[in-house]
């Protein structure tokens, strides 16, 4: 039977590869963050080092991903807009995200749970649970060769994290060229067979 599996961070996590997070079942995922008023500050391939995925009966529907958000990894892209951050900046970025955002969640700090709840011809509904709030996010997907690739947009403020986001945005204002965008792009891919 074909293994049709996808999940995300998404959001999205495991050991490092050129694509970002990779789970033992070959699920790959990452997310893109934007800063600056014109979204010119772009940090791609962000992921997490620790996550657990599960694909019941090797199928995409009801596949889950449980993410330890304190394991954030922003090392794949050192872009700072006009140049590159030094490698030491990764620790600063990871700590800023962990300490000034994820640790400030009122419920389930350090945890994001993801589940594929519906699949259609070229789209799927992906359920995210963060800060005790559950939301279903639409994702588009396509098959390229033997790989299923999916993309979606997640607004972190939909999860009741306004205070945490305000803290994070204030701490990172100069790093993010004046603005931190609360909508992130989530990408994931998995073998289609």
PLM features per residue range, with description:
Residues 4-14:
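Sec-dependent N-terminal signal peptides
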Residues 14-20:
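C-terminal segment of classical bacterial N-terminal signal peptides
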Residues 20-193:
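Low-complexity, acidic/polar, glycine-enriched regions of mature
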């Amino acid at each position: 039977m074909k293994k049709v599996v996808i999940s995300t961070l998404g959001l999205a996590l495991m050991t490092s590869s050129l694509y970002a997070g990779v789970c033992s079942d070959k699920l790959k995922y990452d997310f893109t963050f934007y800063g600056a008023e014109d979204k010119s500050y772009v940090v791609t391939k962000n992921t997490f080092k620790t996550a657990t995925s599960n694909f019941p009966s090797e199928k995409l529907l009801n596949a889950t991903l449980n993410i330890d958000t304190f394991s954030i990894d922003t090392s794949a892209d050192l872009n700072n807009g006009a140049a590159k951050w030094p490698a030491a900046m990764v620790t600063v970025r990871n700590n800023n995200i962990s300490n000034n955002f994820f640790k400030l969640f009122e419920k389930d700090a350090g945890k994001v749970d993801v589940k594929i709840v519906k699949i259609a011809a070229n789209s799927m509904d992906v359920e995210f649970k963060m800060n005790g709030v559950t939301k279903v996010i639409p994702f588009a997907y396509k098959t390229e060769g033997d790989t299923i690739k999916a993309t979606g947009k997640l607004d972190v403020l939909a999860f009741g994290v306004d205070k945490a986001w305000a803290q994070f945005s204030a701490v990172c204002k100069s790093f993010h060229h004046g603005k931190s965008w609360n909508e992130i792009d989530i990408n994931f891919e998995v073998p289609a067979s």
